[in-house]
Amino acid sequence: MEQGAKRVRFYIVAADGLSKRDLFRQPDPFAILTVDGEQTHTTKVIKKSVNPYWNEGFEVTVKPSSVISIRLFDQKKFKKKDQGFLGLVSFRMREVGSFRSNREVSLTRPLKKSSTTNLSVLGNLVLKVAPSKIRAPAGNHSSTTANRTTSTPTTTTARTTRTTPRPTATTNTSNQSTSNSTRNGTSAATSNGTGTGAGTGASHRSSPVTNRQTNNTSALSNSNAHIMSSFEDQYGRLPPGWERRADSLGRTYYVDHNTRTTTWTRPASSTNPVHNTSSDSQRLNHQNRHLPDDSNPSLMQSDSGNDLPFGWEMRYTDTGRPYFVDHNTRTTTWVDPRNPLVRPNGGSSTVGSLMQPQSLSHLGPLPSGWEMRLTNSARVYFVDHNTKTTTWDDPRLPSALDQDVPQYKCDFRRKLIYFRSQPGMRPLPGQCNVKVRRDHIFEDSYAEIMRYSAHDLKKRLMIRFDGEDGLDYGGLSREFFFLLSHKMFDPIYCLFEYSAVDNYTLQINPHSSINPEHLNYFRFIGRVIGLAIFHRRFLDAFFVVSLYKKLLRKKVSLADMESIDAEFYRSLKWVLENDITGILDLTFSVEEDHFGEVRTVELITNGENIEVTEENKKKYVDLVTEWRVSKRVEQQFNAFYSGFVELVSPDLVNVFDERELELLIGGISDVDVEDWKSHTEYRTYIATDPVIKWFWEIIAGWKNEDRSKLLQFATGTSRIPVNGFRDLQGSDGPRKFTIEKAGTPDQLPVAHTCFNRLDLPDYPSKDTLHEKLSLAVENTVGFGNE
């Protein structure tokens, strides 16, 4: 027998992967909810998105037999017959689990075709159904929620036993997710995170605000909450170091200031052995998962017998964390000045083997936004809060490079530190999500990048490849720029061309106007280059010198012609160096072949009738050079430049010269095996193990092209920073290339591109290693979950 009618609240949360029917335009989706063909509600319109997020709730009256229908439409085509339909979800209320219970139910349903139209339909719809008396959460919800797994361990409290969400530990120095993706040669997948085995689902880190589950501990009434302090609740006073707080939905959670973690579960008393074990385990996991804080008891000595240096004072924060005030320089630090500081780098340095606080004070305070910290082994590292990165190098030192490093690298590095420390080059809060298909990366990237404002593109860039669930902590974005640069600079698109038959440097194609949208594409490419510089990524491309000079607004010269057309350059140089009287019959005009049609272009007014003489030949050469390098591609370059300066201010980039700008955009393509080897770390392996020796022997015997492929396989990019492998970037700053013993000899090597790590099984012979490594590098494409 059917139950009577009841009120529920339907939430249309989000849709994921909707069909995109226009090449350069995304739909403006909205949803229409209908109950039994009578009750109708409509969501707002989300502009230009195939992954819309609404999270809108509607009160409806339903019965178990009620038919729920949600239809999605493109608002721009809604009034056009059979064109605006994006998908349909339909089901009966009895199909929704726990209809009779008073709890939330989440649904993810694939979108279906309509019986009245034959349009293709893609994607899923995410819904929530909640009793009307329960207020559904309105936290941040990603359009990919349906693919994530929320951890809901069973927790016993003083009064109730139920399944509750437990937020994972977080700190203010790390936002890394434990969701991992691996690049595995066997399954043709590549990793973007850490992990130990393939095939397990990616975990999703929850927090008190974003977790979607309700909690019994949030049942405190407002009348009781205001009469209790934050250090007690209805069960009594909390243990020392604990605090009770409420999120934006009124749900209670607990903060452990001892370990800087949060939990939905009320902490038990210290006499509870189960809680002690759990707390110890959480502390251990917290220490293993994050960089240690400088408040490590082993490093913070409060013994009054060990006096502070003159002018120093130790104080405490509200949470009891000690910090130190240097009244000499009017600065504060977490680092105890009584502890000797280990030098920042592991190699030789002019700083000395140990840096005492007195020697550091001579360098002056750290730049704005920088902080010095210590690892467990008391090794100093530096945090740049402006760019949210870490480094071993002291930013106050002129250079931490070795003494034999060329001067140009030292100069470039100083400029780079200055360039990246400027406010205009600091990432903005939030994320910029870009989802593309590998086989349509050019078209998808154009649509995604051009729909964002320059402000949004300066947020943290998160790349996602369609059908691959890897989280982007650096490896995916490096792979993205590598693949995209191969596509958008391909001469087949007529946007760029090679400068000469024997030279693979690129220049703007003067005949790009064959594509009526070419100026929009040049603005897009300018944005991509600016985006790569802003987010510290490399493009796998090199341009003619004149293009770098024009980006810096420098005047081009005859010497720049050599990289464009060496034969034409030699001809013009001969004209300047020799008497042309009676030898050459030239006028102030040039001929241009435009798809088989020869056109005459006058360099000056009536130039076709003005003869070039010994007196005016210098002017002729200058005009020809300017036309060949600049004038004939002026429109294209202006569009290209307009996109570039949206991300990178011309006043900032002018600190570099044209050669340094080339390194900033493309890095170094030649792979130095000795430099690679000297800046590699090993886990479980040691440098003298046979497999490691075979590995470097194989790499040394490869061509540079094959080495670049391996580098791209393991790190996501084939380019190297100008300072070599010592400056290789990971997910959170500089991270060395690492080889770890993992897997069995019948498996292929596995790459973790976010962490520059290669999992290498202990192969029995050099031939086996060579075969497996080559197979993995040549045939692995894509990402999967660990």
UniProtKB/Swiss-Prot annotation:
Record keyword Repeat present: yes
Name under which the protein is recorded: E3 ubiquitin-protein ligase pub3
Active-site residue list: C754
Domain of life: Eukaryota
Native organism: Schizosaccharomyces pombe (strain 972 / ATCC 24843) (Fission yeast)
GO biological processes: intracellular transport; protein ubiquitination; ubiquitin-dependent protein catabolic process
CDD domains for this protein: C2_Smurf-like (cd08382), HECTc (cd00078), WW (cd00201)
Region of interest (Disordered), ranges: 134-225, 263-306
Keywords, ordered alphabetically: Repeat, Transferase, Ubl conjugation pathway
Name of the gene encoding the protein in the UniProt record: pub3
GO cellular-component term (any): cytoplasm
Lineage: Eukaryota, Fungi, Dikarya, Ascomycota, Taphrinomycotina
